[in-house]
């Protein structure tokens, strides 16, 4: 029902508020206590009513029901002809927001915001335009003599001034019906008289005033007095001298109402502002709450970054096997019973057949042996590898000095050798450039024509053992006397799928040999294995780090539950001025999300600091590489933690009973 419809009902002879047979009971353990007994009363538009009674008489309970803060156990209560008995909480909030204004004995102002912002709170929930909201709040405060106090917080105001702010707040959305609970109870006599006069003036302007008091002198100021005792109305009479005004207050909220979306954004900003104020008011507690999130996010991001760095380092070392290579090795697959009878199956011709394929860039045959190598008076065991002219290309090795093998080296079976850095240090520790020096390999001399760059951590040769390379034809004929090779490495075109090339080479070799007396190793499969293994390890360690996040989330939930308890009175005030359950839930959920997002950002910053430290201290051994995916995931994760672990406290806040919330300090 719109404001216009409600006013139309009020303009007729129908009562503004009507109570019939109202009963209110409360549970006290296993007992049921009846506070109000068969209450019947009618209040018309523009009346000034005083409900008087001693403490425990039920007058405040009746006021709470009349103000839609509470609902009757039985009976009927109508406002503007509309029954409120079966209205849900948000529908009751709408009535409070658009038609009721509350003046409390203890003022119930929000301590962290200014007088202007306190007065504006009801209009935020009503969807009033921001500029109009501020202008009206300032005008109301000015009309009540507080023009110079609009920016003051409640702690900077006297009791009388705080009560005036409370009155201005009650009028913010129009305040058709003003409910005043002991409005002068906490004031000195002068301030009390001023407040009573303000209420009379408001009544003269057409506002319906309902005061709850135990003071007969205050009740005597009203047009009508309702006496209540032990939950029963014992008297209902009028003061004959009181002149009832005929005017009606204009509806304020309909003139400046925003769109539904604009109103939602306003409420969102209000929730955001209040969340920041709450966080600022408890800085240390907020920081400690964030700590679990900070550590968890930093751990996850650092572990993922370290895993990524390790993976990249390992994969870069695979370049020693070639960028995209397939190695064919002599012998039946492991576990095949034929393996023990025939292991000499690969020939240089097999390597050449593979080299002739269009998807193969180059091939290097290979065979290996361990032999004694001597240079002058230095003799050591070394690994000897016979390789093809394209070995440097397929292996990814690079020369530090000298040259590699060429076609003539293979055809003429030259006794040229290439040594690695270990052999250089072992046999020529004092010779910077050993090119041209001669080593004795067994009984065969070999002339050094090249030295390889150090390849620490690579996969092709031992880190410590000296390794010498010579043309495979030289090794076959001069060192081991064999017509067979142990393996060959094929460098595959990067535009070709390595799995397709592997299948094609397998088919070719099977066709040539008539059987599968060979084994194939794909460097890409090694890469995939390393990637999957690294990912699994990263996931495992991240799972442990995520436990910290969960603990941090539980910490957020605990602190938010404490915050809800501490701010119960604030929640009650917001509900009294018309906040929906969703508004309350939104406010506390935003606070939890803000704590987690801020904790997540600090955690990401800490992870960057840890990564920088590791990169500086670890050198080439450890590298932390951050990806945008992990950072975005961490940010999203911290947000989700705020939503998940902030939901329960936010829901508890939204489900609070307004009357119970207002009664707590």
From Swiss-Prot:
Pfam families per UniProt = ABC_tran (PF00005), FtsX (PF02687), MacB_PCD (PF12704)
Q: What are the entry keywords?
A: Antibiotic resistance, ATP-binding, Cell inner membrane, Cell membrane, Membrane, Nucleotide-binding, Translocase, Transmembrane, Transmembrane helix, Transport
Intracellular or extracellular location(s): Cell inner membrane
Q: How far does the signal peptide extend, from start to end residue?
A: none
| CC terms in the record's Gene Ontology section | plasma membrane
The protein's topology relative to the membrane is: Multi-pass membrane protein
Q: Does the keyword Membrane apply?
A: yes
Cite a single GO MF annotation.
Answer: transmembrane transporter activity
**Residues that bind ATP, according to the entry?**
53-60
Q: A GO BP term, please?
A: response to antibiotic
EC numbers for this chain: 7.6.2.-
Transmembrane feature ranges: 287-307, 544-564, 588-608, 630-650
- Major localization listed first in the record, in broad terms: membrane
Q: Which InterPro entries match?
A: AAA+_ATPase, ABC3_permease_C, ABC_transporter-like_ATP-bd, ABC_transporter-like_CS, MacB-like_ATP-bd, MacB_PCD, Macrolide_Exporter_MacB, P-loop_NTPase
UniProt superkingdom: Bacteria
Tell me where in this chain the ABC transporter domain is found: 17-255
| Subunit structure comment from the entry | Homodimer. Part of the tripartite efflux system MacAB-TolC, which is composed of an inner membrane transporter, MacB, a periplasmic membrane fusion protein, MacA, and an outer membrane component, TolC. The complex forms a large protein conduit and can translocate molecules across both the inner and outer membranes. Interacts with MacA.
Q: Which family does it belong to?
A: Belongs to the ABC transporter superfamily. Macrolide exporter (TC 3.A.1.122) family.
Q: What does this protein do?
A: Part of the tripartite efflux system MacAB-TolC. MacB is a non-canonical ABC transporter that contains transmembrane domains (TMD), which form a pore in the inner membrane, and an ATP-binding domain (NBD), which is responsible for energy generation. Confers resistance against macrolides.
Cross-referenced PANTHER family, in alphabetical order? MACROLIDE EXPORT ATP-BINDING_PERMEASE PROTEIN MACB (PTHR30572:SF14), MEMBRANE COMPONENT OF TRANSPORTER-RELATED (PTHR30572)
- The protein depicted here goes by the name Macrolide export ATP-binding/permease protein MacB
Q: Which gene encodes it?
A: macB
């Amino acid at each position: 029902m719109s404001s216009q419809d409600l006013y139309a009902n009020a303009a007729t002879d129908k009562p503004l508020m009507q109570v019939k047979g109202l009963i209110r009971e409360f549970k006290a353990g296993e007992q049921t206590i009846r506070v109000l007994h068969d209450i019947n009363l009618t209040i018309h538009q523009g009346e000034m009513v005083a409900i008087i009674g001693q403490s425990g008489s039920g007058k405040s309970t009746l006021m709470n029901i009349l103000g839609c803060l509470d609902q009757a156990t039985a009976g009927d209560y109508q406002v503007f002809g509309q029954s409120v008995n079966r209205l849900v909480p948000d529908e009751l909030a709408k009535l409070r927001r658009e038609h009721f204004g509350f003046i409390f004995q203890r003022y119930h102002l929000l301590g962290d915001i200014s007088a202007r912002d306190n007065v504006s709170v009801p209009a935020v929930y009503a969807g009033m335009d921001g500029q109009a909201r501020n202008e009206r709040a300032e005008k109301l405060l000015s009309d009540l003599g507080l023009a110079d106090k609009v920016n003051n917080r409640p702690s900077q105001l006297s009791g009388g001034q705080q009560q005036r702010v409370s009155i201005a707040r009650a009028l913010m959305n129009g305040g058709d019906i003003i409910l005043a609970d002991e409005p002068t109870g906490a004031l000195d006599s002068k301030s009390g008289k001023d407040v009573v006069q303000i209420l009379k003036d408001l009544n003269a302007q057409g506002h319906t005033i309902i005061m709850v008091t135990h003071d007969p002198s205050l009740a005597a100021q009203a047009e009508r007095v309702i006496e209540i005792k032990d939950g029963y109305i014992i008297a209902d009479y009028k003061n004959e001298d009181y002149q009832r005004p005929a005017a009606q207050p204009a509806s304020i909220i309909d003139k400046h109402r925003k769109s539904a979306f604009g109103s939602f954004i306003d409420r969102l900003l209000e929730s955001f502002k209040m969340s920041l104020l709450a966080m600022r008011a408890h800085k240390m507690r907020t920081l400690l709450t964030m700590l679990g999130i900070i550590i968890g996010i930093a751990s996850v991001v650092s572990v993922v970054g370290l895993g990524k760095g390790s993976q990249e380092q390992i994969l870069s070392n695979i370049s020693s096997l070639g960028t995209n290579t397939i190695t064919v090795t002599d012998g039946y697959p492991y576990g095949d019973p034929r393996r023990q009878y025939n292991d000499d199956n690969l020939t240089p011709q097999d390597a050449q057949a593979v080299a002739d394929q269009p998807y193969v860039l180059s091939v290097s045959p290979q065979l290996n042996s361990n032999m004694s190598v001597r240079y002058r008076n230095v003799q050591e065991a070394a690994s000897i590898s016979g390789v093809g002219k394209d070995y440097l290309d397929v292996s990814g090795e690079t020369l530090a000095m000298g040259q590699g093998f060429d076609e003539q080296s293979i055809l003429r079976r030259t006794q040229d050798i290439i040594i690695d850095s270990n052999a250089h240090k072992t046999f020529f520790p004092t010779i910077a450039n050993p090119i041209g020096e001669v080593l004795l390999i067994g009984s065969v001399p070999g002339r050094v024509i090249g030295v390889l760059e150090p390849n620490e951590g690579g996969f092709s040769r031992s880190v410590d053992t000296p390794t010498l390379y010579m043309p495979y034809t030289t090794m076959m004929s001069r060192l081991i006397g064999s017509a067979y090779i142990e393996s060959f490495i094929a460098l595959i075109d990067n535009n070709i799928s390595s799995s397709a090339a592997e299948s094609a080479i397998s088919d070719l070799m099977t066709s040539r040999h008539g059987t599968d007396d060979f084994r194939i190793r794909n460097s890409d499969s090694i890469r995939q294995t390393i990637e999957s293994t690294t990912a699994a390890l990263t996931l495992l360690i991240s799972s442990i780090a995520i436990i910290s996040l969960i603990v941090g989330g539980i910490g957020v939930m605990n602190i938010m539950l404490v915050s809800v308890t501490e701010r119960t009175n604030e929640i009650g005030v917001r509900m009294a001025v018309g906040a929906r359950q969703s508004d309350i839930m939104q406010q506390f959920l935003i606070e939890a999300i803000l704590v987690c997002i801020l904790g997540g950002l600090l955690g990401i910053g800490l992870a960057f600091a840890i990564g920088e430290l590791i990169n500086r201290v670890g050198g080439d051994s450890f590298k932390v590489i951050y990806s945008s995916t992990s950072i975005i995931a961490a940010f999203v994760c911290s947000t989700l933690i705020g939503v998940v672990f902030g939901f329960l406290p936010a829901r508890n806040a939204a489900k609070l009973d307004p009357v119970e919330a207002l009664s707590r300090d």
